[in-house]
């Protein structure tokens, strides 16, 4: 039965006026929304590969000339404190595409292609497309993520269509990535003769010895950076030609630092301190980050901030999963106090480092200090500077600073990057900095917990654990029963202290039910060196551990404690019979030096086809002949 509603004339007029007002308000909001969408800026993101601020003249670089980037800086705003999170391409681009630190996703090891829950984690180009933007990418993806083709998130990704905005609908706002590979590390490979830039005029980092091969490598890469600068010009010229220069926010940055040895892949300033220049047309001057173009901006910016900021500039949805801070625009967020970077496996080489810094000071925690930073890495050694530097060191010609790269590391480092951009004067024990160091250590731990840092287990161990429970590493790291991060952080910190008073703690930890705790316990025993002799029986028992990561570290420690036969037998069995962590085993055999030579010689004599990468380098360094 329909209920009849009776209204007086006054009630009717009142209701009608309210309805009309609501309609007008809705119409006004609709027009405002349409106007807002109509005025949305085009965004052009120019990226170059592998160059830190060291190489650009607008940042004070003297080795080459970059007039086009310099001009962009004069027309825009030059950020002086922009830092990459990973110091190498694939983990960086994983961070960019998801708006999340790769360590939070489990995508931090180079070329790992670990899966993530794609129903939870969104890619920023998808969100821009959903909001009406035309998105294009020329032509760099390399997102290091499994479960989805990289190109799927872009409206246009075609190597033959460099200027993607030319393929949008009329009047459609665009977000275009145009990447230059001209400054990629590979451009410094091989012969370095007949360079345009003079090797004798190159300014070297203080950690590099003054060798002709190193100077030539610098000059060859300086040529590459100048070619990259010309790529930037070509793209900007195309934008001007299309009449879009004053309608487009232009962003330029590199994807990380590099490329001379000890920059790319390493979390020092030369690997992480990157250029960031933003040109904002006059029509959008209300979001200028400084009073006028040409000015420097000293705000602290992390690469993880970028995708969130781009979405904000476009007025699009920003998922809660995005972990950065909006550093530009109407919705700018408070400046963070610190930036966090991470390092894990790069190609065939295992490592694990975390770095936290502000605008001046940087604190590092080396989770694998028993390994030198300067490990042979096949791709890096294609630059003449790398083998030349290594040879110089092996001949005993390096000093305390130039030789440190090839020696085992301390557990912690701390640098004043304003006075010491090259990060060579470790101030970790300086009395005047102890309060600051303590604050930064607390901030690092807090951030690791906030991000569910997945790197506190060896790569193979965390992959295995996630697979056993049919989970992604992202999901596993958020399950405290499977991944008790606080306990791992505590265990790692205790191990890295190298305090002989912790021997009973390590011995007890070796019988823990969690292989992660056992791993950090054996690392602690390893770092105690001869102070671990009372734990020899415990280490021998660990050779039967169900975790090969624990076995390998226990065996190496026994070799160092003069129980060579016992330790080498375990390593021999793993090498001959297979292991769940073959890459770690090969790294350890290299780190062992001469102790591993008999084992490697025996193995390669029977398996000459395995003389590749690390094993081939061990053979070369120690004169092991390999039959053809």
Positions of predicted regions on the chain:
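Formylglycine-dependent sulfatase
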Residues: 2-406, 421-442
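Long, internal low-complexity/basic segments
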Residues: 3, 13, 17, 34-41, ...
């Amino acid at each position: 039965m329909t209920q009849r509603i009776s209204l007086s004339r006054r009630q009717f007029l009142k209701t009608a006026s309210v309805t009309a007002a609501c309609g007008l308000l809705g119409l006004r909001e609709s027009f405002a929304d349409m106007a807002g969408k109509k005025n949305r800026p085009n965004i052009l993101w120019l990226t170059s590969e592998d160059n830190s601020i060291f190489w650009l003249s607008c940042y004070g670089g003297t080795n080459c000339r970059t007039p086009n980037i310099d001009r962009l800086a004069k027309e825009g705003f030059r950020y002086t404190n922009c830092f990459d999170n990973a110091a190498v391409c694939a983990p960086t681009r994983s961070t960019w595409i998801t708006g999340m630190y790769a360590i939070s996703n489990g995508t931090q090891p180079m070329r790992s292609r670990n899966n993530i829950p794609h129903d939870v984690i969104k890619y920023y180009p998808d969100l821009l497309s959903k909001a009406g933007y035309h998105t294009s990418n020329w032509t760099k993806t390399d997102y290091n993520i499994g479960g989805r083709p990289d190109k799927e998130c872009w409206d246009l990704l075609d190597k033959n269509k460099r200027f993607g905005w030319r393929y949008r609908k009329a009047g459609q706002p665009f977000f275009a990535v145009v990447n230059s590979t001209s400054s990629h590390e590979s451009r410094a490979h091989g012969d370095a003769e007949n360079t345009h830039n003079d090797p004798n005029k190159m300014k070297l980092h203080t950690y590099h010895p003054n060798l002709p091969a190193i100077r030539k490598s610098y000059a060859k890469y300086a040529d590459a950076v100048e070619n990259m600068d010309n790529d930037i010009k070509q793209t900007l010229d195309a934008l001007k030609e299309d009449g879009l220069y004053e309608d487009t926010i232009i962003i330029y940055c590199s994807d990380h630092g590099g490329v001379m040895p000890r920059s790319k892949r390493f979390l020092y300033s030369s690997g992480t301190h990157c250029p960031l220049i933003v040109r904002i047309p006059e029509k959008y001057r209300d979001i200028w980050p400084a009073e006028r173009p040409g000015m420097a901006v000293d705000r602290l910016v992390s690469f993880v901030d970028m995708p969130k900021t781009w979405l904000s500039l476009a007025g699009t949805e920003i998922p809660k999963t995005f972990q950065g801070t909006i550093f530009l625009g109407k919705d700018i967020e408070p400046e963070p106090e610190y930036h966090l970077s991470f390092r894990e496996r790069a190609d065939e080489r295992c490592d694990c480092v975390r770095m936290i810094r502000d605008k001046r000071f940087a604190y590092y925690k080396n989770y694998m200090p028993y390994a030198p930073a300067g490990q042979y890495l096949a791709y890096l050694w294609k630059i003449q500077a790398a083998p030349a530097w290594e040879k110089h060191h092996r001949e005993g010609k390096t000093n305390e600073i130039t030789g440190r790269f090839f020696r085992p590391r301390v557990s912690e480092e701390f640098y004043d990057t304003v006075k010491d951009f090259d990060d060579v004067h470790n101030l970790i024990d300086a009395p005047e900095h102890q309060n600051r160091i303590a604050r930064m250590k607390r901030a690092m731990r807090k951030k690791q917990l906030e991000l569910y840092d997945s790197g506190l287990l060896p790569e193979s161990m965390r992959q295995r654990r996630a697979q056993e429970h049919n989970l992604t590493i992202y999901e596993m790291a958020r399950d405290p029963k499977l991944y008790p991060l606080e306990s791992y952080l505590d265990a790692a910190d205790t191990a890295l202290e190298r305090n002989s008073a912790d021997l009973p703690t390590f011995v007890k930890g070796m019988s823990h039910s969690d292989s992660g705790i056992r791993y950090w316990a054996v690392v602690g025993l390893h770092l105690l060196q001869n102070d671990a002799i009372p734990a020899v029986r415990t280490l021998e028992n660990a050779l039967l551990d169900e975790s090969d990561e624990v076995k390998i570290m226990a065996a190496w420690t026994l070799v160092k404690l003069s129980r060579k036969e016992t330790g080498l037998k375990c390593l021999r069995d793993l090498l001959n019979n297979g292991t769940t962590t073959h890459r770690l085993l090969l790294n350890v055999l290299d780190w062992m030096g001469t102790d591993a030579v008999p084992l490697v010689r025996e193995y390669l004599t029977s398996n000459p086809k395995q003389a590749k990468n690390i094993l081939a380098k061990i053979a070369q360094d120690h004169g092991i002949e390999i039959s053809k």
